[in-house]
């Protein structure tokens, strides 16, 4: 089973274990700072750092263990990580005990309940799928309340009946002791369920029922444990009917009180994060501190702390995620996952370490084996009976296969162990027997059932969860079905899940969101804007994917066989050449002109023309770079994300251009009066420069002829103001490409960025690019005067990005026939 790659990985773990065993003897060799009567430069103060040092070492050991386990996928795919950690704990505990013969490190109830359990439960509540959880809340509550009471009562009474028969021998246990043991061993552990079921990947409904039961049965477990412990303290003869009634009332107080505390702190957390706009750096701290305070407050009031922190995470997640920044949300997500994973690792490892203590072990074969049998049998019976009742009212039935997995998934863990360790040995005489049996039950359920549940799920062909993001179409149809079902329930007068969900959504939108969410977050949550944003993302992805499918600028620049294979030549395009013009003219000798000087001039002419067209396209349509502002280090704020603001500006600018094109296509009007004036001015400039001696332009007029400021091309809506400064000193070369705009007769929306090649004014080819000196200009050859250079057969010009003049709404028309290019006149192509 063990992979050879794991061999070297165990060496650091064993070395750390030996170091931990030797740390206890370090205190004896410490020297006092002034033992020699003189000043000492360096002193050894182990006692000063003993506790935090040992804690850090154990965390390091647990983290290294996870790395070692995942070096081989074959091991972790068969054996659950929780089982591996328990085995590792047994090994390390054996090493520690062999060195000192004392159980130096054990899992104490204080460590578990106050430091290890809260991060795990908070993570489960904060990332809980709320709709799935509340949609199955009735089923979860039935299993959590009735099921836990059923398991506790039947297990305790059955063990007591066997004890009366004499099979267990002489034990100092009464009926209340058996019921107390049944109450702590009956609860399904959320830590164990999470550790095993996350690796199995069962379907969402089955997972949320088992996991929700493990979370919500805490209230029942705490109440039963406290009630029976009080009864044991009072004695069986002193218990009255009033005490039983108080126990029943205590259940409602503990469960509802813990839930109420969690909701109150969730409200407080959401309200605080609404006003943290200027202190983004401490937003994650509020999430963890206030959530932890809900746990401690419930524990202080003797309420259900697990329910408190669970509902705190469930109720605050929507508003907190909307209020805090993206960086803070990422910090909260990763920190919470890290704390939960680390706490879970330490819990299972310390369960193994705690078992290596001969003092706690008291063996009774009949008691241990019958406990394993009873918890398994009564768990299955309870699930079957409750499911039979639930299926009469559930729309989605729980099949027999689901019931088998639910019965087999009743795992026990560290909660049961921590509760049994809390027992007072003076009141419960057989405490060690209870502790030993609890450890056996935990190891059996986590290791044996954890090992076999995955093959069982595969053998039964249980429906697995789909790890994918639903498509936009699925979301829209799902939302439409929700409204339809809610309307049907409203018309029929039936109050169901859809009706309640719709009423809650309206209440949240009208009242809660306005109080707990900042205004900017309320606007960003608008569904229409979200759908519009997703449609535009899909639009952009489609354009990029189509561009990659048809080819790229790299093909034009580097016409090699390696790049040519990436271009799709399956769709024929009207063209006068079959290969790259650049490649043909640069690599092949003309059959007409054999003068090498003329050939070189022709090459330079075509190359310059390509560069001009490319530069023109990039300068006009691409986003202008912004000057980067260097922020100094600050402890109180993060460096702002420049890319996020730039992406938003690009998005807004592109959408304004597309909306303007949409107006012109629908109304049949020009896009912009300024664009028309600009075109007329370019026509006049073209007539003035129609006759150029030697193909050169006067250099003093270059700046005026080729520089058109960005404000001349503004659309009807002003662009969003920005704090950035444009980089100065760059090449300002932007020629007008606008003609008299007429409405396109074809269907679809004109996109300026993907406009047809006819929009390119041939006058730009008659001008000297600003990066060329007067001495570098050449007279184009005869062939270059007659024909404008073309790209490969499936491209129109050197602007391969503009594959279609339509948006993605009419993208299917991009492969249709296109008009033949009109060759430019020789007069318009003078350089």
Swiss-Prot record:
Gene3D superfamilies in the record: 6.10.140.1330
Transmembrane region(s): 49-71, 80-99, 109-126, 130-165, 179-200, 203-234, 242-276, 279-301, 304-320, 328-356, 365-386, 400-423, 431-464
Sequence ranges on the Extracellular membrane side: 29-48, 100-108, 166-178, 235-241, 302-303, 357-364, 424-430
Positions annotated to bind a 1,2-diacyl-sn-glycero-3-phospho-(1D-myo-inositol): 135, 138-139, 395, 494-495, 497
Coiled-coil intervals: none
Signal peptide annotation: 1-28
Domain of life per record: Eukaryota
Single GO term (MF): PDZ domain binding
Keywords: Antiport, Cell membrane, Endosome, Ion transport, Membrane, Phosphoprotein, Signal, Sodium, Sodium transport, Transmembrane, Transmembrane helix, Transport
Domain characteristics, as noted in the entry: The C-terminal intracellular domain is subject to extensive post-translational modifications and binding partner interactions which regulate transporter activity, scaffolding functions, downstream events and localization.
Name of the protein: Sodium/hydrogen exchanger 3
């Amino acid at each position: 089973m063990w992979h050879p790659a794991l061999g070297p990985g165990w060496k650091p773990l064993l070395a750390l274990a030996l170091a931990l065993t030797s740390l206890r003897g370090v205190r004896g060799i410490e020297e006092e700072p002034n033992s020699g009567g003189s000043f000492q430069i360096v002193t050894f103060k182990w006692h000063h750092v003993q506790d935090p040092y040992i804690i850090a070492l154990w965390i390091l050991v647990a983290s290294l263990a996870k790395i070692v386990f995942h070096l081989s996928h074959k091991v972790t795919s068969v054996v659950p990580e929780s089982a591996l950690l328990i085995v590792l704990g047994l090994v390390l505990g054996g090493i520690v005990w062999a060195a000192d013969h004392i159980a130096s490190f054990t899992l104490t109830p204080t460590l578990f309940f106050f430091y290890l359990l809260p991060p795990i439960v908070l993570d489960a509540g904060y990332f809980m799928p709320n709709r799935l959880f509340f949609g199955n809340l009735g089923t979860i509550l039935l299993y959590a309340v009735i099921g836990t009471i059923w398991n506790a009562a039947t297990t305790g009474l059955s063990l007591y009946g066997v004890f009366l028969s004499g099979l267990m021998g002489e034990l100092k246990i009464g009926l209340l002791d058996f019921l107390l043991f049944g109450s702590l061993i009956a609860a399904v552990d959320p830590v164990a369920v999470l550790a095993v079921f996350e690796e199995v990947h069962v379907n969402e409904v089955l997972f949320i029922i088992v996991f929700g039961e493990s979370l919500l049965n805490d209230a029942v477990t705490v109440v039963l444990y406290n009630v029976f412990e009080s009864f044991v303290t009072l004695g069986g003869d002193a218990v009255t009917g009033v005490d039983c009634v108080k126990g029943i009332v205590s259940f409602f107080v503990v469960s509802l009180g813990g839930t109420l505390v969690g909701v109150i702190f969730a409200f407080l957390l959401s309200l605080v994060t609404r006003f943290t706009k200027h202190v983004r750096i401490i937003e994650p701290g509020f999430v963890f501190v206030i959530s932890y305070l809900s746990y401690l407050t419930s524990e202080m009031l003797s309420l259900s702390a697990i329910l408190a922190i669970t509902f705190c995470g469930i109720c605050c997640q929507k508003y907190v995620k909307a209020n805090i920044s993206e960086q803070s949300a990422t910090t909260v997500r990763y920190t919470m996952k890290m704390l939960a994973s680390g706490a879970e690792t330490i819990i299972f490892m310390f369960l193994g370490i705690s078992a290596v203590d001969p003092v706690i072990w008291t063996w009774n074969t009949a008691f241990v084996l019958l406990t394993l049998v009873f918890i398994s049998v009564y768990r299955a019976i309870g699930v079957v009976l409750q499911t039979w009742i639930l299926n009469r009212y559930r729309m989605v039935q729980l099949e027999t296969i689901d019931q088998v997995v639910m019965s087999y998934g009743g795992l026990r863990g560290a909660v049961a162990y921590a509760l049994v360790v809390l027992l007072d040995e003076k009141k419960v005489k057989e405490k060690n027997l209870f502790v030993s049996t609890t450890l056996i039950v935990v190891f059996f359920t986590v290791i044996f059932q954890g090992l076999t549940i995955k093959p069982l799920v595969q053998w039964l062909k249980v429906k697995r969860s789909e790890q994918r993001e639903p498509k936009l179409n699925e979301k829209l149809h799902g939302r439409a079905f929700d409204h339809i079902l809610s309307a049907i329930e409203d018309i029929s007068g039936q109050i169901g899940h859809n009706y309640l969900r719709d009423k809650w959504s309206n209440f949240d939108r009208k009242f809660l969101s306005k109080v707990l969410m900042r205004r900017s977050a309320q606007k960003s949550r608008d569904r229409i804007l979200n759908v519009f944003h997703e449609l535009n993302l899909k639009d952009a992805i489609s354009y990029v994917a189509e561009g990659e499918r048809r080819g790229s600028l790299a093909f034009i620049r580097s016409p090699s066989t390696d790049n040519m294979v990436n271009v799709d030549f399956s769709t024929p395009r009207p063209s006068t050449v079959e290969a790259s013009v650049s490649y043909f003219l640069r690599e092949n000798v003309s059959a007409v002109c054999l003068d090498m000087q003329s050939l070189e001039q022709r090459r330079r002419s075509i190359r310059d023309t390509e560069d001009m067209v490319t530069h023109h396209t990039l300068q006009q349509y691409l986003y202008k770079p912004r000057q980067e502002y260097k922020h100094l280090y600050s402890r109180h704020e993060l460096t702002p994300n420049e890319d996020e603001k730039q992406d938003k500006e690009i998005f807004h600018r592109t959408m304004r251009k597309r909306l303007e094109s949409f107006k012109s296509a629908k109304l049949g009007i020009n896009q912009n009066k300024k664009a028309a004036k600009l075109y007329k001015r370019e026509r006049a400039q073209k007539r003035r420069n129609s006759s150029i001696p030697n193909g050169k332009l006067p250099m003093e007029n270059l700046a005026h002829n080729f520089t058109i400021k960005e404000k001349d091309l503004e659309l009807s809506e002003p662009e969003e103001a920005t704090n950035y400064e444009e980089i100065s000193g760059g090449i300002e070369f932007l020629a007008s490409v606008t003609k008299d705009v007429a409405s396109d007769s074809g269907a679809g929306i004109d996109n300026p960025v993907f406009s047809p090649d006819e929009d390119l004014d041939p006058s730009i080819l008659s001008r000297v690019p600003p990066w060329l000196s007067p001495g570098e200009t050449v007279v184009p050859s005869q062939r270059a005067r007659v024909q404008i250079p073309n790209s490969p057969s499936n491209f129109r010009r050197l602007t391969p990005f503009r594959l279609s003049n339509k948006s993605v709404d009419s993208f299917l028309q991009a492969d249709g026939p296109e008009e033949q290019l009109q060759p430019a006149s020789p007069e318009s192509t003078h350089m």
